[in-house]
Amino acid sequence: MTDLGLGSSIDIGLTLMALVALETVLSADNAVALAALVQPLPTPQQQQKALNWGLVVALVLRIALLLTATWVVQFWQFQVAGALYLLWLVGKHFWLQLQPDPATPPNSKPSSTFWHIIPLIAFTDLAFSLDSVTTAVAVTDRLWLVLTGCLIGVVTLRFLAGLFVRWLEEFVYLQDAAYLTIFSVGLKLLGKAIQPELVPPDWTVLAMVTILFTWGFSKRSVELVSEDATSIVPEQMHLD
């Protein structure tokens, strides 16, 4: 009995670790996407608050998706809807970039309302979760384990998104890299729903996302570089 109980506990622990690892790996591209959504908000306080409220709603939607996962996977239309939503976000971002307002300074943030961003966060996370939730359900049939992994995944996502919000201000190409990542996830989701055998393996998608992130972090903002330089000069003068 003791050995049986110990074996069951080890099995549960390993399954939970697998779910947490799965959620963590799948959170990186999701996090940078959510960070890009809140970046237009005018203050860091509003950005953090929008992430908090948006992910609370997202957690509710994730749980609803988990509870109905066996039903949802029967309908490819859900994946198509999620894919089209992600592709719409990307198209909207680059369309606005191609049509700047002459009266708006080139580096200024577009106006977005706090309550407009929250549903965008929730539905974007839901679209990203369509793939990961079905994978998590395949790992184990213990619902409480999947829910625990889901909760840990949202906490991890919140932490990573907070980091990316700061990095989006520091690195010039990171926002475009974020939306190109959303584009790749949207295409994968669309292909999986329409023609699953043509979808590339996960490692190729991961490699592409890694390349996009590398490009995104390749150039720092000129303003931040100049600020760093001016902060170093007085220290050097003092040492001299």
Locations of regions flagged by a protein language model:
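Multi-pass alpha-helical transmembrane bundle typical of ion/small-solute transporters
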Residues: 1-240
